[in-house]
Amino acid sequence: MPQLDTSTWLTMILSMFLTLFIIFQLKISKHNFYYNPELTSTKMLKQNTPWETKWTKIYLPLLLPL
């Protein structure tokens, strides 16, 4: 049974990593990033609902006579 020749594996693996690194660098360099990001307000704006603008009263259920 012949022996598996692994002498070229190191160069193949290193060249693959180098190629992947270059490809990812080129992909990342094409993205546009904000130069000076500004903080945005995360506070929720209160929305007025119809029942908040009116006066409301909670009524108890009618008491049934015993």
UniProtKB/Swiss-Prot annotation:
The modification N6-acetyllysine is found at residues 54, 57. GO terms for cellular component: mitochondrial membrane; proton-transporting ATP synthase complex. InterPro entries: ATP8_mammal (IPR039017), ATP8_metazoa (IPR001421). GO terms for biological process: proton motive force-driven ATP synthesis. Keywords: Acetylation, ATP synthesis, CF(0), Hydrogen ion transport, Ion transport, Membrane, Mitochondrion, Transmembrane, Transmembrane helix, Transport. It is found in: Mitochondrion membrane. Pfam families: ATP-synt_8. GO terms for molecular function: proton transmembrane transporter activity. The modification N6-succinyllysine is found at residue 54. The chain crosses the membrane at residues 8-24. It comes from the Eukaryota. Its main location: mitochondrion. It is a single-pass membrane protein. Belongs to the ATPase protein 8 family. Component of the ATP synthase complex composed at least of ATP5F1A/subunit alpha, ATP5F1B/subunit beta, ATP5MC1/subunit c (homooctomer), MT-ATP6/subunit a, MT-ATP8/subunit 8, ATP5ME/subunit e, ATP5MF/subunit f, ATP5MG/subunit g, ATP5MK/subunit k, ATP5MJ/subunit j, ATP5F1C/subunit gamma, ATP5F1D/subunit delta, ATP5F1E/subunit epsilon, ATP5PF/subunit F6, ATP5PB/subunit b, ATP5PD/subunit d, ATP5PO/subunit OSCP. Subunit 8, of the mitochondrial membrane ATP synthase complex (F(1)F(0) ATP synthase or Complex V) that produces ATP from ADP in the presence of a proton gradient across the membrane which is generated by electron transport complexes of the respiratory chain. ATP synthase complex consist of a soluble F(1) head domain - the catalytic core - and a membrane F(1) domain - the membrane proton channel. These two domains are linked by a central stalk rotating inside the F(1) region and a stationary peripheral stalk. This is ATP synthase F(0) complex subunit 8. The lineage of its organism: Eukaryota, Metazoa, Chordata, Craniata, Vertebrata. The gene is MT-ATP8.
